[in-house]
């Protein structure tokens, strides 16, 4: 398959390889979503992919699926709709998927992230070492979304601690 060849070649020549998946398309089933999640974990294990992200489908204006969902009256175009397009709240559990609930999609997204990052770090323990070695450096540069989120959390803790000590 050309996709796997591209991933394999990019990783072999030293490129940073990151995969992004969208789950929960209107026609998808639970099995379809699980296939995407396990494919991401497989690529992390087999080829050394550095980052695997999962997003839940949302219908974008002008797209074929948007028009289809609008025609079927499965989405309402109002201010709230556009507000939700620009900001994704992980606690929101809405789904356009006919076969999977919003709560299940949120769980699958979390499961996908968890499985992928566990695979990314356990399959190549040097990444754990490099992360901790570089984390407290002034010029820390995260190699994936997980590291960025940990770093953001750390910075917020430091700022809150500093703010509380001033008060």
Predicted regions and their residues:
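A structural motif corresponding to the C-terminal lobe/cap of the Radical SAM core domain
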Residues: 1-127
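Membrane-proximal basic amphipathic "stem/tether" segments
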Residues: 104-167
């Amino acid at each position: 398959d050309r996709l796997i060849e591209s991933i394999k070649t990019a990783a072999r020549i030293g490129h940073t390889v990151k995969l992004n998946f969208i789950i929960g398309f209107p026609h998808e089933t639970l099995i379809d979503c699980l296939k995407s999640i396990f494919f991401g974990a497989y690529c992390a294990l087999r080829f050394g992919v550095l980052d695997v992200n999962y997003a839940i489908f949302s219908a974008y204006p002008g797209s074929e699926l948007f028009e289809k969902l609008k025609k079927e009256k499965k989405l309402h175009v109002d201010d709230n709709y556009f507000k939700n397009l620009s900001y994704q709240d992980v606690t929101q559990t809405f789904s356009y998927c006919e076969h999977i609930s919003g709560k299940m999609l949120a769980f699958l997204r979390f499961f996908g992230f968890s499985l992928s990052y566990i695979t990314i770090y356990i399959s190549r323990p040097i990444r754990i070492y490099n992360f901790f070695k570089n984390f407290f450096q002034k010029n820390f540069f995260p190699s994936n979304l997980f590291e960025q989120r940990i770093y953001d959390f750390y910075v917020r803790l430091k700022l809150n601690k500093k703010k509380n000590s001033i008060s």
